[in-house]
Amino acid sequence: MKAVIFAYHDMGCQGVQAVLDAGYEIAAIFTHADNPAENTFFGSVSRLAAELGIPVYAPDNVNHPIWVDRIAELAPDIIFSFYYRNLLSEEILHLAPAGAFNLHGSLLPAYRGRAPLNWVLVNGESETGVTLHRMVKRADAGEIVASQRVAIAQDDVALTLHHKLCQAARQLLNSILPTMKCGDIPSVPQRESDATYYGRRRPEDGLIDWHKPVSTVHNLVRAVAAPWPGAFSYNGSQKFTIWSSRICPDAQGALPGSVISVSPLRVACADGALEIITGQAGDGITVQGSQLAQTLGLVAGARLNRPPATSGKRRIRVLILGVNGFIGNHLTERLLNEENYEVYGMDIGSNAISRFLLHPRFHFVEGDISIHSEWIEYHVKKCDVVLPLVAIATPIEYTRNPLRVFELDFEENLRIIRYCVKYRKRVVFPSTSEVYGMCTDASFDEDKSNLIVGPVNKPRWIYSVSKQLLDRVIWAYGEKEGLRFTLFRPFNWMGPRLDSLNAARIGSSRAITQLILNLVEGTPIKLIDGGQQKRCFTDIRDGIEALFRIIVNDGDRCDGKIINIGNPDNEASIQELATLLLDSFDKHPLRCHFPPFAGFQVVESRSYYGKGYQDVAHRKPSIDNARRCLDWEPSIAMRDTVEETLDFFLRSVDIAERAS
């Protein structure tokens, strides 16, 4: 049986050797070039392949059509991935008749995602393992072929557990690969209800919070001990790293972060003390705890965990145009929760952001982007990141006011984009799921799906094509003039402060707000064309967290990217949304203050939206880019979002006025 292998790290070396030992022919190995900035303590797959005389490649993008074609020419019967760091495209996964299989360092479905080795230690688990599973489009979600458990000892640290997992992986592969070679491949579906997902860990995640329980701090030390970057703290401005520790149950009543003693070096936590066995000051050498205390000048009673002063470091300035809107006001709240962000905003109203107006890091001007061009240009020049969120984005307006949609959504925003080009500012631009139009793909891929719209005599598409054209202009500015940009495409975000009931009264609102108005006023819920159109509804909290991570842009991974932000698991028809909303309404404590339910009413889209409207049967995102670039996964169930949105609107109604 001919195999193509994708592999890296020690696990990759173990996997390659196990495949050879099982009698497979390896046609080629794909790996990664080592990163000079990374501590490469592990074995080299490329060196092993060269020694074995196997062709080895390290492409920047293995999913590029050129490499897909080359892999297809190899005609693999089976594909294996052993700690290869990039997701493989569906085109590659489908090249092998027997399938593609990945070795994951946990007992799936627990600890999907990245760095499971470190996360199980952070969380104080007593057991983990390795799992061989079939690869599908969604990372780590395919059927399980085989797994092997590994006990985690109390004295295990990241490196010792890594060695245990490598040994377990080799044992697992030695037992299952010969069976698979004969065509007998077990397949056990994963229980999605048991799935957990963890994202990438960064060196800065090793900062110790002494207010945590001592077991939590000790587990962090274990999880990132050498050769990982280490858990660290500060004595004033001096950073130091803790490489090994033990738990002491008695903190002697000291405040968290207080040095209890220097020989041995013990520091108080929330419910005990951490004894520092070995550590390192700055870039110095590793020494025992008492010597570390001497090097740092610690004395009993000193307080740790005081990061270096940042008064000289300027905060990141974020300009949000349309700051009073649904996304704008929620994003403002998220940014102001972080000390290193300052928000400048403009909008034609301030009702949704009134809670921020006195905040020292929030600067607001009431104005219209069509008029206040000088203010906007000045603040584009002044700020670091620009989010032009102003747009007409309610379907009924596409047929009512198509020219106004074009003027605002395209022309006014193009001017802002040109300011960003002129002053070389990063722009995070809200594209839309509407750009996919009537795409027939099962899920919409940012980089591959066709953008399909209706004929010119259907003005309903003016919003979609305005946004799409601006997407293309931004992309061209990035390619030709170096504009730093990220395009994000929200898929039906919902939550408190979405539109208003007054907007719903004139038909200029999103679907759920209109449905809530029907319930509040006791009018029939109108199901446009029967309400069978399917959408994927996303909680605003999930959406904003993804958008915040785009702004943070860790490792510049979002530069030049288009990122869908939606929840594929929350797919429902408008009729199903209405039914769920009605159920929540009937259970709400304020239900008795509102009229009886007036029933459902099926209406034609033309009678509701007017001439020139077309609807879309389904709209489901692929979120692989979001997972890869943001380490993000939506987690909030649709029912929770519906209940919270409903509660917000019901409590905004003047019950006393209604009763009178």
From Swiss-Prot:
It catalyses: UDP-alpha-D-glucuronate + NAD(+) = UDP-beta-L-threo-pentopyranos-4-ulose + CO2 + NADH; UDP-4-amino-4-deoxy-beta-L-arabinose + (6R)-10-formyltetrahydrofolate = UDP-4-deoxy-4-formamido-beta-L-arabinose + (6S)-5,6,7,8-tetrahydrofolate + H(+). Bifunctional enzyme that catalyzes the oxidative decarboxylation of UDP-glucuronic acid (UDP-GlcUA) to UDP-4-keto-arabinose (UDP-Ara4O) and the addition of a formyl group to UDP-4-amino-4-deoxy-L-arabinose (UDP-L-Ara4N) to form UDP-L-4-formamido-arabinose (UDP-L-Ara4FN). The modified arabinose is attached to lipid A and is required for resistance to polymyxin and cationic antimicrobial peptides. This is Bifunctional polymyxin resistance protein ArnA. Homohexamer, formed by a dimer of trimers. GO terms for cellular component: membrane. InterPro entries: Arna-like_SDR_e (IPR045869), Bifun_polymyxin_resist_ArnA (IPR021168), Epimerase_deHydtase (IPR001509), Formyl_trans_C (IPR005793), Formyl_transf_N (IPR002376), Formyl_transf_N_sf (IPR036477), Formyl_transferase-like_C_sf (IPR011034), Lipid_A_modif_metabolic_enz (IPR050177). (6R)-10-formyltetrahydrofolate binds at R114, V136, K137, R138, A139, D140. UDP-alpha-D-glucuronate binds at residues 393, 398, 432-433, 460, 492, 526-535, 613. It holds the Pfam family Epimerase. Pathway: Nucleotide-sugar biosynthesis; UDP-4-deoxy-4-formamido-beta-L-arabinose biosynthesis; UDP-4-deoxy-4-formamido-beta-L-arabinose from UDP-alpha-D-glucuronate: step 1/3; Nucleotide-sugar biosynthesis; UDP-4-deoxy-4-formamido-beta-L-arabinose biosynthesis; UDP-4-deoxy-4-formamido-beta-L-arabinose from UDP-alpha-D-glucuronate: step 3/3; Bacterial outer membrane biogenesis; lipopolysaccharide biosynthesis. CDD domains: Arna_FMT_C (cd08702), Arna_like_SDR_e (cd05257). Its EC number is 2.1.2.13, 1.1.1.305. GO terms for molecular function: carboxy-lyase activity; UDP-4-amino-4-deoxy-L-arabinose formyltransferase activity; UDP-glucuronate dehydrogenase activity. Residues 314-660 are annotated as: Dehydrogenase ArnADH. HAMAP family: ArnA. The active site is at H104, E434, R619. NCBIfam families: PRK06988.1, PRK08125.1, PRK11908.1. Keywords: Antibiotic resistance, Lipid A biosynthesis, Lipid biosynthesis, Lipid metabolism, Lipopolysaccharide biosynthesis, Multifunctional enzyme, NAD, Oxidoreductase, Transferase. The record marks N102 as: Transition state stabilizer. The record marks D140 as: Raises pKa of active site His.
